[in-house]
C-alpha cells in the first residue's frame, strides 16, 4: 500500500511540474501542421503586383501591407508573401534559361544542317573540280553526257557565224552569211564595213619590152604590150620544141648512116651534116656569126 501511494504522488507532482513549466517564461514550441493555400483572388493580386507594378523583391513594410490587403480574401501571413515572390522569380529565371537553351540548340542544329548540306555540295561531281572538255551542247560528267541548254548553243553559233561574216566581208567581199532566223544581230556584225576586193599580183611585174626598156605592170592589170610579149614567148616556146624534134630526128638518121659508112667518109659526112643543120636551125642569118 505504501509503495502504490508513493507512485501516485510522484505522478501528480510530475504533472504539476509540467504545468508550471508551461506557464513559465519559456514557451513550448509546437510545430504547425497547416500550410498556406492561396485563393484565386490572392494569386490574381500577387501577379498584378509582380507584372503590372514591377514589384520583384518587396521590403518588410511592403510585405506587411500586401499581407494585410490579402487577408480580406483568406488566411495569409507575411512570410507567405515573401516566399511567393522568391519562388516566382526563380521560376522566371528557369523559364528564360530553358528558352535560351532551346533557341541555342535550334540554331546549332540549323548550323549543323547547313554545314552538312554545304559538305555534300562540295563533294558533288559538279563542284569537285574542272570537268573534261566536251563538244558544244553536251556536258561530260561521271555518269555520261548531259545535253546543255540549247539557247547557249544557238548564241554560240550566232557569234561564230557573225565572226565568219565579218571576215568574209573584210577580206573576200562576200555577203549574205547570216545566223538563224529570229536571232538578234551582234554589235560586231552591225559595225562592220564592206571593202572592195583586192587583186594581188601573182606574176613578176617587171618585164622587158620590145625596145629593151624595163616596164612595170600596173596594180590590178598589165599594159597593152604585155599581150605581145606573151604571144612572142609562146612563139619562141613552139620554135624551141620544133628544134628539139629536128635534133632528135637528125641524130637518129646520122647514127644509122654512120654504121653503114667507113671511118673517114663517115667523119666527113658528119661534119657536113652538122654544119648544114646549124645553118638551117639557127635563128640568125647566114654569115652574121
Curated annotation (Swiss-Prot):
- What induces or represses this gene? Induced by the cytokinin 6-benzylaminopurine.
Q: Gene name, please?
A: WOX1
GO biological process, any: negative regulation of DNA-templated transcription
> Where does the record place Gly residues bias?
12-25
Top-rank taxon, per record: Eukaryota
Q: Which PROSITE patterns match?
A: HOMEOBOX_2
- What does the entry state regarding organ or tissue expression? Expressed in young leaf primordia. Expressed in branch an floral meristems. Transiently expressed in the shoot apex.
Kindly list the GO molecular function terms attached to this UniProt entry: DNA binding; DNA-binding transcription factor activity
User: Taxonomic lineage of this organism?
Assistant: Eukaryota, Viridiplantae, Streptophyta, Embryophyta, Tracheophyta
UniProtKB keywords: Developmental protein, DNA-binding, Homeobox, Nucleus, Transcription, Transcription regulation
Biological role stated in the UniProt entry? Transcription repressor required for the formation and development of tiller buds and panicles. Required for tiller formation and female sterility. Required for the early developmental stages of axillary meristem formation. Plays a role in maintaining the axillary premeristem zone and in promoting the formation of the axillary meristem by promoting OSH1 expression. Does not seem to be involved in maintenance of the shoot apical meristem (SAM).
Q: Supply the source organism for this entry.
A: Oryza sativa subsp. japonica
Where does the record say this protein resides?
A: Nucleus
**InterPro entries, per the entry:** HD, Homeodomain-like_sf, WUSCHEL-like
The record's annotation in SMART domains points to:
HOX
| Similarity remark | Belongs to the WUS homeobox family.
Its recorded name reads WUSCHEL-related homeobox 1
Q: Where is this region: Disordered?
A: 1-34
